[in-house]
Amino acid sequence: MKRITFFMLAFAAMVSSLVVAQDKPLSPQATVEGKIGPANVKIVYCQPSARNRKMLGGKEPYGQVWRTGANEATTIEFDKPVKVEGKDVPAGKYSLFTIPGENEWTIILNKEPKQWGAYKYNEKDDLLRVKVKPTKTDNFVETFNIALGKDEVQLKWENTAVAFKVKA
């Protein structure tokens, strides 16, 4: 009887330690919400970290469509019509893809918001493509970050910052 009790206690301790020992995800999900003019903006993305790897122009090659984060494709949602870099965007939810480049980035809003990565990305579903210039950050940004400015969306990772204008 003592043996059975001992094994049951040992098993319970082992199972509970597995539950407690869950690591946080490598690329946790983040949500950015705010206003640009009268429009509410919501961006949902996963935040990869460099972890001693060359990411932009390395693991995420220049000249190829990138999901602009990790895991699911990043989504951006506007509750009112806006202009992105001067181009009309109806209210709605879109995938946010980019094509990174050393001297120029392409920002893509795609009409299909439910995508895993960029594996089934189809250019035919693009609502718009605009080109913007990257800048260098003052400090190294370990974890990919998206933020809302007064009239722009800002992407930062490693030593690169990219912003695109949004006006409502």
What are these regions (language model features)?
Residues 21-90, 95-168:
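Targeting-peptide/extracellular-domain and disordered-appendage signature
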